[in-house]
């Protein structure tokens, strides 16, 4: 079964490789959802702990959620991203945050990819996060990351808060993967703001000072970091 699934996705791999070489795909017309948008109420079949399971946005009520899209199974950059997020899943869960990977492949393709060892040229191996199938492309379309010419999604990432509101989004073109470190830093920054009411400056990390959002109050930060008297 796995071999037949792998054979069926080979043409898709060739399409993606061709697009990466010719740069024929652009972000023209792509309008991803951004801050203050409510996350669409998606539902679909995912591979969870080696089994098929229906998951939905409603399952994550009261939690932070990072939903990230990738173009295709059995490709090149995609497994590096998915395994990197999966391997650090426990760190995100300690912050009441779940992760979902999603593409426009079928759940059978996802399962075949997960059952392929990492040592075999880009297999996923053991997954600690759900890999969601969006075979009808409704989810990618709803989040605004679907390329309608090719039927695949761009590398969109959405940070959704416990109320279901999108707080952060980014979209990469196909050839560049995303940073797990930056996703984790951004999550911690938004959670810090929610808890403390102060705002986070450029390149903030949790061992650095934040800014009190007021004309007079903010001077404390700038004196500290710029050495003003």
UniProtKB/Swiss-Prot annotation:
Active site: 78
Gene3D superfamilies: Glutaredoxin (3.40.30.10)
Gene Ontology molecular function: any one: thioredoxin peroxidase activity
A GO CC term attached to the entry: mitochondrion
Listed Pfam families: 1-cysPrx_C (PF10417), AhpC-TSA (PF00578)
Annotated ranges, domain Thioredoxin: 33-192
Top-rank taxon: Eukaryota
Keyword list, A-Z: Antioxidant, Disulfide bond, Oxidoreductase, Peroxidase, Redox-active center
CDD domains: PRX_Typ2cys (cd03015)
UniProt cross-references to InterPro entries, sorted A to Z: AhpC/TSA, Peroxiredoxin, Peroxiredoxin_AhpC-typ, Peroxiredoxin_C, Thioredoxin-like_sf, Thioredoxin_domain
Enzyme nomenclature, EC number: 1.11.1.24
Class in the EC hierarchy, top level: oxidoreductase
Gene Ontology BP terms: cell redox homeostasis; cellular response to stress; hydrogen peroxide catabolic process; response to oxidative stress
Catalytic activity, reaction form: a hydroperoxide + [thioredoxin]-dithiol = an alcohol + [thioredoxin]-disulfide + H2O
Subunit record text: Homodimer; disulfide-linked, upon oxidation.
Annotated family: Belongs to the peroxiredoxin family. AhpC/Prx1 subfamily.
Misc. remarks from the entry: The active site is a conserved redox-active cysteine residue, the peroxidatic cysteine (C(P)), which makes the nucleophilic attack on the peroxide substrate. The peroxide oxidizes the C(P)-SH to cysteine sulfenic acid (C(P)-SOH), which then reacts with another cysteine residue, the resolving cysteine (C(R)), to form a disulfide bridge. The disulfide is subsequently reduced by an appropriate electron donor to complete the catalytic cycle. In this typical 2-Cys peroxiredoxin, C(R) is provided by the other dimeric subunit to form an intersubunit disulfide.
PANTHER family: THIOREDOXIN PEROXIDASE (PTHR10681), THIOREDOXIN-DEPENDENT PEROXIDE REDUCTASE, MITOCHONDRIAL (PTHR10681:SF128)
Job of this protein: Thiol-specific peroxidase that catalyzes the reduction of hydrogen peroxide and organic hydroperoxides to water and alcohols, respectively. Plays a role in cell protection against oxidative stress by detoxifying peroxides and as sensor of hydrogen peroxide-mediated signaling events.
Name of the protein in question: Peroxiredoxin 1
Organism: Brugia malayi (Filarial nematode worm)
């Amino acid at each position: 079964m796995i071999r037949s699934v792998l054979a069926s996705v080979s043409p898709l791999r060739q399409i993606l490789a061709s697009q990466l070489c010719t740069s024929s795909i652009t972000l023209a017309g792509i309008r991803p959802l951004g801050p203050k948008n409510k996350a669409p109420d998606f539902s679909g079949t995912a591979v969870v702990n080696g089994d098929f399971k229906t998951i939905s946005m409603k399952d994550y009520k009261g939690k932070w959620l990072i939903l990230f899209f990738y173009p295709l199974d059995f490709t090149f950059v995609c497994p590096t991203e998915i395994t990197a997020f999966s391997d650090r899943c426990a760190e995100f869960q300690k912050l009441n945050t779940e992760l979902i990977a999603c593409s426009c492949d079928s759940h059978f393709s996802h399962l075949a990819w997960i059952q392929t060892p990492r040592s075999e040229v880009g297999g996923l191996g053991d997954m600690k996060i759900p890999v969601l199938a969006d075979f009808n492309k409704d989810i990618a379309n709803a989040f605004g990351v679907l390329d309608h010419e090719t039927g695949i999604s761009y590398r969109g990432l959405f940070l959704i808060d416990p109320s279901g509101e999108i707080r952060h989004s980014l979209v990469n073109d196909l050839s560049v993967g995303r940073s797990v470190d930056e996703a984790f830093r951004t999550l911690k920054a938004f959670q810090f703001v929610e808890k403390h009411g102060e705002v986070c400056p450029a390149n903030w990390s949790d061992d650095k000072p934040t800014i009190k959002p007021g004309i007079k109050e903010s001077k404390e930060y700038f004196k500290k970091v710029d050495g003003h008297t």
